[in-house]
Every structure is written in C-alpha cells, then in structure tokens.
Amino acid sequence: FFEANIELADPIPQFNLFDKNQVVYTRPRLLPPAKIFGTWLNHSVLAEGSIIHAKKIERSIVGIRSRIGENTEIAKTIVMGNDFFETIEEMMAADVPLGIGRECYIENAIIDKNARIGKNVYIRGSITLPDSETDTHCIRDGIVVVKKNAVIADGTRIGLGA
C-alpha cells in the first residue's frame, strides 16, 4: 500500500493516473482547488481542497481537504486528508486543529483521515524501528501510521531520533 501510493508521484509510475487506458472512476466532490503558500514541492501529488503552508513536501501524496502548517517538512509520506472542513471558529476552539500543525517534520509515515497533529511534532519511520502500537499510532514495517481521528499533542516525538 505504502510503496504503491508513493510511486504515484514518480514521473511515470506503474499505475499512471494520467493514462487514458487506465481510467480511474470516482465520484465528483466539487471541492475548490488546492491552495499553496511558499511551499517547495517535488515528486508529490496534491488533492483538491487542500491548504498548504508547508516549507517542503517531497515524494508524498496529500489527500483531499488536507491542512499543513507553516515551516512543516514532509517526505515520503501519505496524508490521507480529511472528511470535512473545519470552520475558523472550530479551529480556534480546538486544542489541536484538524490537519498537520506548523514546524513539524514527518517522514516515512501514513497519516490517516481526520488526524490532528499539533505544532512542533516529529514523526520519522525507519526499517530499524520495531513494530509497536499505541492509542494514536502504530509502527509496521518501519512505517509510522497515525490512526484515523488521532490527536497528536504539540511537541510529540515518534520514531527514529525521537
């Protein structure tokens, strides 16, 4: 799953979403296009409805309605996105708003839907990490998986170098 999705960001992946002979059928969501502010992007796919303020996104997939905060760096990661948008009032009232906060570093990870990742969070998967599981995340085959609807508090460190 992880490698197949990350490969979608390759110049010509094995499963090419732009190949007219390999049609992908989905339902229209009628979302606005992604908005990107000052982000360096390389070999990445961004879905509609996303608002991105990240410093850098490389070799990653960013799903629908994703929010990524300022100065965050993401590498070789699948961000599944969100099922809904939060209002400004909801974001201000939440301890940790929907999406990925500012000043985070995330590498070799899958961030499941509707996850809330606080500010200054460090997540780094590695094949050297043993499989493990907590209420908010698990590590399988070196990939850190943040669970659906999980809340990761500000300053949390997970994985290699934590």
Predicted regions and their residues:
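Left-handed beta-helix
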Residues: 1-162
